[in-house]
Every structure is written in C-alpha cells, then in structure tokens.
Amino acid sequence: MDLAYLWFWIVGVLFVGYFVLDGFDFGVGMSLPFLGKDEVGKRQIINTIGPVWDFNETWLIVAGACLFAAYPEWYASLFSGFYLALLLILLALILRGVSFEYRPQREGLRWKKGFDTMIVIGSVLPALLWGVAVANLVQGVPLDENHEYTGSLLTLLNPYGLLGGITLVLVLFLHGLYFIGLKTDAQVHQDAKRLATRVGFITVVVAAAFLIWTIFIAAAHEAPLLPLVIAAAALAAVALLLSMFFHTKEREGWAFT
C-alpha cells in the first residue's frame, strides 16, 4: 500500500469518526422542538452532550487538515466547488456553539427560545448539507479540465443529493434520540423512546430508497467496486435494522452503538 492509499483511508476514518461522534450531537439538537416540555426537560436534553459536543468537532478539523496535506488538489476542488455549502455549514456550527455556551447565561424565556431555535438550525442544516455533499461526491460532480467545479449550489441540490441529505438528517436524528434515551430518565426518556420508534420506521424507508438508488448509480457508472458498494449498502441496512431491534428490546446502549 502506497502513501496515497494510506492517506485515503486515514482521511476516510477521520470523516467517519466525525459523522459518528458529532452526528448524535446533531440528533440531540434536532430533538429540542419535540422533547422537553419545560425548561428542566430541555436542560436535561442539552446536558447529555454538554461535556462532548465541542470535542467531537475536532474530528472535522483534523480531517480537513489531513485532506489538505495529503490531497491538496482534491482539497482545492472540494472547498472551492462546495464553497457556499461549506460556508453555510460553518455559520450553522458557529450559531450552534454560541447557543450552547450562552443559553445557560440568559434567564429570559425569549432568549431561551431563540437559542433553542439556533441549536436546531445549527444541527439540521449541517447534517442536511453534509448529506447533500457526500451524495454528490458519490454521484459525481461536474469538473473542467483544470479540476475546477463548474456547477453551483443549485447543481448540488438535485434529487439524489437531496435524498442523501434527508437520509443523513433522519439517521443522525435517530442516533441522537437513542443517545437521549440512554442518558436520561423519567418523562424525557419515555418521550425519546416513543419518538425514536416513529422516526425509526421513516428512516428505514428513506434510507432504503437512498441505498437502492446508490447501487443503481454505481451500476450505471460501471464502477469496478460495485460489489463493495452493494456490500456496504447491505451492511448499512443491517446496522439500521439491528439498531431498531435493540431499541424495541429496550437495550438502548446496543441501539446507540
């Protein structure tokens, strides 16, 4: 294995680590409009990720640095072509971080609701745009002979890209609900379990559509790694179904894992 392949796997592992570890943070943020009927409940929800949310974002910084160091041309094409989408992600993450830090310091109900809204936006928007970006990388994006992106943000918002974004939002939302169910008790715990059951069924349907479409895209492109794509899709489907199975058995730790 030469260095190009080695760094490819390193960058891949770092991005996967980011989506897994910061992903459930996004899911917890998405849950605020649906869980926690009072300030005590919402505070309980936010406290589940209080010690870890900022550390988990370190994975993204390290992944971006490794991508720049190992594949500068790829980095340049990605960050110039997806500039607006990545800028929106960055702004959303800033809003989310500010809201986490300043929400406990403001006592007014209007301030609390405003910070809660920013947390939700800062959780949904990055998940949606990351899903759109990854789906477009799988599908392929228009590049010229200089490897410069020739499309726009609207080019990325194609049906397959949007389905990828919605799929990631639902998966991370479900992951966050499992985490809330694992870390809370009383009313918040029960509400999170009920909501996770409903969201789980929707996620299975949407994720199945996305995975099937992904296989068809790989087949249409005559991808040499088509068997690997099929195996990865099957593994993702099995993992999602197993998480729902463990959730129904009230084994929240296994469902979250």
What spans do the regions from the language model cover?
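N-terminal signal-anchor module of multipass membrane proteins
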Residues: 1-55, 61-64
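Alpha-helical transmembrane segments
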Residues: 7-18, 79-93, 120-121, 155-171
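Membrane-embedded alpha-helical segments in integral membrane proteins
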Residues: 8-9, 15, 62-74, 206-217
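Membrane-water interface of transmembrane alpha-helices
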Residues: 21-22, 26-31, 90-103, 170-180
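The first (N-terminal) embedded transmembrane alpha-helix
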Residues: 22-23, 55-67, 127-133, 169
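Transmembrane alpha-helical insertion/packing segments
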Residues: 47-69, 193-207
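Membrane-interface helix-loop-helix modules in multi-pass inner-membrane proteins
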Residues: 52-123, 144, 220-227
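Long, contiguous internal "core" modules enriched in hydrophobic/ aromatic residues
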Residues: 102-256
